[in-house]
A protein has these predicted regions:
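ATP/NTP-dependent adenylation/nucleotidyl-transfer catalytic domains that generate, transfer
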Residues: 150-152, 210-211, 236, 260-336, ...
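Enzyme catalytic cores with a strong preference for nitrogen-chemistry domains
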Residues: 1-334, 350, 361
Length: 594
């Protein structure tokens, strides 16, 4: 057996900021060298950020990526880090003639090995995901190479992200090609329970291939996606050896005992990949002789977050990175005293600090004194900025000019509030946070250009019952501080905001249950219809009331046009409103209850 010390660089790149991403790669490679690493592995497309979407269809962007890769190799050598082998992700291109159905320029989701100022080998993702949030058939052509480099007597293979999730391809070839270690750069977005699925997958692939696997995952928020890190090292027998933290950057350094190289030959050869394709295996040698034995480091296995803490951390990171990466210094939101705006304000305070959160209290003639009191109580507990802007006078002015009644009059109040928030955003440069939850978005219980107006929607993918669960969990953390918890001495959310019956307060005595069933009845139905794509017959067979099924399906289907105009927000479920669920607005198909 031979020893290797490997550094897994779980970083948070910014899409399109090639210079900053490259500087970070150099910085973290230096940190890995200080800790005695023999190899440093970065995440998928760590040089360009991920996902880059249609940027890869621009020749200028692909050329910039290729130039940045060469410049990075030179810079690492100039910084005295040339002896450190470094695996980085970037955008490459294939030498293919243009053809119909092929992405312009034939881009590749590439991974490269840099050593001694040179790009030694290049690889690219073979399996292109085209489901859920992924559209990689649109953006990339598949790679067909498996690089294996010999480092201190160990043969190390490189495969990218989805190649680990699918059968066949480079991972299937790695073991037969003699690899003792498989490194996989990843940009695998978060959703609930995915961490358990991910560990089970990596363990199974390790056992199948007979290779230890390094799974290096991106961390950070990128528009609707949140990347949770949670990088893994698994032995050839499938046992967890080391694990990085969730939702935080980390340099995870681990020592492994690995089998010495079995094959002597270098160069290239072709082999069947088990998925009907042929993979070209490319062997190169960096160093043939194993290292002298040394005292290994004790491996680190980060404490895993329980589900509620995991979801809350994802929401905080999403808000923090959306604000930071888009150049905002502060956020603004309407604070009603209800639970949705209370949770949104708390997430924002935890993300960027209460001093950068601005709340606007906008009571109408229908707002209760206790709601205004609850909003003021939250402001006091958290120390956020606030201002009071009563809306009755503005609403009255509208109604003098335009005669409105019923729902139109109710929605006018929400639209006045939205206009006030957008005006203050324009004046002061705040990012407007909308406060709607997934249950409301599903059934259209929101006002277009009113409470839906804004730039980012932190709880867009959070069902109402989970809003309450997250709020109670956050209050239970009072007195604690950390990466995702501002150190509030008292529970940051007033208890009355959690316990009172929800209401939009747009008419006298209004309650959500005037229009909707109880949320503990509604949310399971929405979960089954939206996230599990059950039809009406399946929903009834699952135990949902037939009349309610018919009513809720109709509401969900008719609200598609509203959701298309809603701001982006972080995905935390297997199917969010946005990238995951794509339905026509003009659509006459209706489910029927059988």
């Amino acid at each position: 057996m031979a020893q290797l010390r490997i550094a897994l660089a779980q970083t948070n790149p910014a899409v399109g900021d090639l210079a900053a991403n490259a500087a970070r790669i150099v910085e973290w490679t230096g940190r890995a060298a200080e800790r005695g690493a023999h190899l440093t592995v970065f995440t998928e497309m760590s040089l360009t950020g991920y996902p880059v979407e249609d940027l890869v269809l621009r020749t200028s962007f692909v050329e910039a990526s290729l130039a940045a890769l060469e410049a990075l190799a030179t810079r690492l050598a100039e910084e005295g880090l040339g002896e450190m082998p470094v695996v980085v992700g970037y955008v490459d291109r294939a030498n293919l003639a243009p053809r119909v159905g092929q992405p312009k320029g034939a881009p590749l989701d590439g991974a490269a090995l840099i050593h001694r100022g040179q790009v030694v080998v290049r690889s690219a993702k073979h399996h292109l995901p085209n489901y859920g949030v992924f559209d990689e058939y649109r953006y990339f052509v598949r790679g067909d190479r498996l690089p294996i480099f010999r480092l201190h007597g160990v043969d190390v293979a490189i495969a990218v992200c989805e190649d680990l999730w699918q059968e066949g391809g480079p991972v299937a070839v790695a073991a037969d090609a003699g690899a003792g270690l498989l490194v996989t750069p990843n940009a695998s977005p978060y959703e609930r329970e995915k961490d358990d699925v991910r560990l089970a997958l990596v363990s199974r692939r390790a056992r199948e291939s007979g290779c230890a696997i390094l799974y290096v995952n991106q961390v950070g928020g990128q528009d609707e996606l949140v990347f949770d890190g949670d990088s893994l090292v698994v032995s050839a027998s499938g046992e967890l050896v080391a694990r990085a933290a969730q939702f935080a950057e980390e340099l995870l350094v681990v020592d492994l005992d690995l089998p010495e190289a079995r094959f002597g030959g270098l160069g290239t050869f072709e082999t069947e990949a088990g998925d009907g394709t042929v993979i070209t295996v490319e062997r190169v040698e960096l160093s043939a002789r194993p290292l002298e034995p040394y005292e290994p480091l004790t491996p680190t296995v980060a404490e895993h977050l329980e589900d509620t803490a995991e979801v809350y951390s994802a929401l905080v990171l999403a808000v923090r990175d959306y604000v930071r990466k888009n150049g905002f210094q502060s956020v603004i939101l309407g604070l009603s005293g209800g639970i949705d705006s209370a949770l949104t304000a708390t997430i924002a305070s935890d993300a960027i600090g209460p001093e950068r959160v601005h709340a606007v209290l906008m009571p109408s003639r229908y707002s209760s004194e206790h709601s205004l009191g609850d909003a003021r109580e939250l402001v006091e507990r958290q120390g956020i900025n606030s201002r009071l802007v009563p809306i009755s006078g503005v609403v009255d002015a509208f109604e003098k000019e335009i005669e409105l009644s019923g729902l139109a009059a109710e929605n006018l109040q929400a639209r006045v509030r939205g206009t006030i928030l957008m005006g203050l955003s324009n004046q002061h440069g705040h990012l407007v946070l909308t406060t709607g939850n997934k249950s409301e978005l599903a059934v259209g219980y929101s006002t277009l250009y009113g409470d839906s107006a804004g730039g980012f929607a932190p709880i867009k993918d959070v069902l109402k019952t989970l809003v309450w669960e997250l709020s109670r969990w956050r209050n239970a953390q009072a007195g604690r501080s950390g990466e995702f918890l501002y150190g509030f001495a008292r529970p940051p959310i007033p208890e009355n905001s959690i316990e009172k019956e929800p209401s939009a307060e747009l008419r006298p005595g209004q309650r959500d249950t005037d229009s909707l069933p109880e949320y503990d009845v509604l949310d399971p139905l929405l979960h089954d219809y939206v996230e599990k794509d059950m039809g009406s017959a399946e929903l009834v067979a699952a135990g949902h009331d037939p009349a309610l099924v018919a009513r809720i399906i109709r509401l969900v289907d008719l609200a598609e046009y509203k959701r298309r105009q809603y701001p982006p927000g972080p995905k935390i479920t297997p199917k969010n409103f946005g990238r995951d669920r794509r339905l026509p607005i003009t659509n006459r198909w209706r489910e029927t209850t059988l």
